[in-house]
Amino acid sequence: MTDEEQNSLLNILSDEHTRNILQETMKEPMSADELSEACDISPQSVYRRTDPLTEHGLLDARMEYDADGHHYRTYTADPTQIVVEITAEDINVAISQQERMTDRFIEFVNHVRNQ
């Protein structure tokens, strides 16, 4: 990760509402309206925070459709852990991502099919 990317990520994570969005979406996938209610911020504020989180790979956005055919996005936090290491020489930000059970199952099925 470049210094510019690290600085951008640290800036994003310095916001309390952004951290709340990450925590809420670690529990379960949530729409912007659900996040608005859970984090006590406007839907516009949710979008202002989910866009950079998605760009940095910290949130996964997925399109969902309701029974009436209307579409909306749900967000799921991707990182398992974000570690900031500060030394006298450098600052490093590391993101470790948990392999999801569904991803492991799909990989297993594909492996079985190829044999």
Pin down the residues of each PLM region:
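Amphipathic alpha-helical dimerization/coiled-coil segments
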Residues: 80-115
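Glycine-centered, phosphate/nucleic-acid-interacting loop/turn motifs that mediate DNA/RNA or nucleotide
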Residues: 57-58, 63
